[in-house]
UniProtKB/Swiss-Prot annotation:
InterPro entries assigned: Glycosyl_transferase_4, PNAcMuramoyl-5peptid_Trfase, PNAcMuramoyl-5peptid_Trfase_CS
Single Gene Ontology MF annotation: UDP-N-acetylmuramoyl-L-alanyl-D-glutamyl-meso-2,6-diaminopimelyl-D-alanyl-D-alanine:undecaprenyl-phosphate transferase activity
Name by which UniProt lists this protein: Phospho-N-acetylmuramoyl-pentapeptide-transferase
Topology of this chain in the membrane: Multi-pass membrane protein
Species of provenance: Nitratidesulfovibrio vulgaris (strain ATCC 29579 / DSM 644 / CCUG 34227 / NCIMB 8303 / VKM B-1760 / Hildenborough) (Desulfovibrio vulgaris)
GO annotation, cellular component aspect: plasma membrane
């Protein structure tokens, strides 16, 4: 909004020329979302407590019983901070901004329904898996249908580490991208089991994709680094800045011991958005590296369930997702969280190295 209001005046007031720089607005989007989260956070948490929006703990995770009653649906705080900051600092004429907000709010709405169902039933049973999946696919298909209508966007798939290997998937690109978004959404959701565990890697991924998106939207840099050029997509770096800022602000209250949990309204929206960011900058396959922690957590659940069925009741892990396995081994929660954050940061650095390793 500020860009649309003030930048046109830059010919008369030269200081407003600074608004044309995406890096400037991304930095301020980060700062704004962070400040909004920290300022609004205490009152928001108190509001959740008054509404009795409290976390119900799965009975199998006995070591978490002390967390019962902690306010949940903190993802609404993230959603407010991100949306406010993006509307303030982004170029609102850019279609990629509105599509990203559509995905962010769409997946967030699914998470809200899931959380609300749990609160009404007063247990941790929300939407059925099939209902949640269908909602996720619906939002992802709608977003992808609108995205491929944009003339500047292509259905080519880029392969990391390989120059010029960009096959055009045609109509097959839509189901592929939908799978990326839905898988990412569920991956973050499964990882959100310890205080600050999911938001840390999400912040790392937000930083990494802000760089990839800025590069993809800059013709000269994209050409030099030989990454797919997507005209206009660089503006989404402002959204990434807001996402990182809101994530840091939420971590202020979600760090161990957590004062609030993000709930599915947070994890589903963040995961779906990370998947969409990967799609926007044509780094869908690289999401496996950037979000490697989410991939491992998801695979641990798939392997556990599959092995349990085919082995007649045996298990690979003491409990899935993987972070619960480490908990049952006696590793302190705070140590698990920090180690996962470190792993996520290393994966982020590996992903960024792809910019030169071609």
């Amino acid at each position: 909004m500020l860009y649309n209001l003030l930048y046109p005046l830059s010919s008369d007031i030269t200081v407003f020329n600074v608004f044309r720089y995406i890096t400037f607005r991304s930095a301020w989007a980060l700062a704004t979302a962070l400040l909004v989260s920290i300022v609004v956070g205490p009152r928001f948490i108190a509001w959740l407590q008054r509404l009795k929006c409290r976390q119900f703990i799965h009975e199998d995770v006995t070591c978490h019983m002390s967390k019962a009653g902690t306010p949940t649906m903190g993802g609404l705080l993230i959603g407010f901070a991100v949306t406010f900051s993006v509307l303030l600092w982004a170029d609102l004429r850019n279609p990629y901004i509105w599509l990203t907000l559509l995905v962010f709010t769409g997946f967030g709405f699914i998470g809200f329904l899931d959380d609300y169902t749990k609160l009404r039933r007063r247990n941790n049973k929300g939407l059925t898996a099939s209902a949640k999946f269908l909602w996720q696919v619906g939002v992802a298909v709608a977003a992808m249908y609108l995205l491929v209508q944009l003339p500047a966007y292509s259905t080519k798939l880029a392969f990391p580490f390989f120059k010029g290997l960009t096959p055009d998937l045609g109509w097959l690109y839509i189901p592929f991208a939908v799978a990326v978004m839905v898988g990412s959404s569920n991956g973050v959701n499964l990882t959100d089991g310890l205080d600050g565990l999911a938001i840390g890697p999400t912040i790392v991924a937000g930083i990494v994709f802000s760089i990839f998106i800025y590069v993809a939207g800059h013709s000269q840099i994209a050409g030099y680094l030989q990454v797919p050029y997507v005209p206009g997509v660089g503006e989404v770096a402002v959204f990434c800045g807001a996402l990182v800022g809101a994530g840091l602000g939420f971590l202020w209250f979600n760090a161990y011991p957590a004062q609030v949990f993000m709930g599915d309204v947070g994890s589903l929206s963040l995961g779906g958005t990370l998947g969409f960011l990967a799609v926007l900058c044509k780094q869908e396959l690289l999401l496996l590296v950037v979000g490697g922690l989410f991939v491992v957590e998801t695979l641990s659940v798939i392997l556990q369930v599959g092995y349990f069925k085919f082995s007649g009741g045996k298990r690979i892990f003491r409990m899935a997702p993987l972070h619960h396995h480490f908990e049952l081994q006696g590793i302190p929660e705070s140590k698990i969280i920090i180690r996962f954050w470190i792993t996520s940061a290393l994966l982020g650095l590996i992903a960024l190295s792809v910019l030169k390793l071609r």
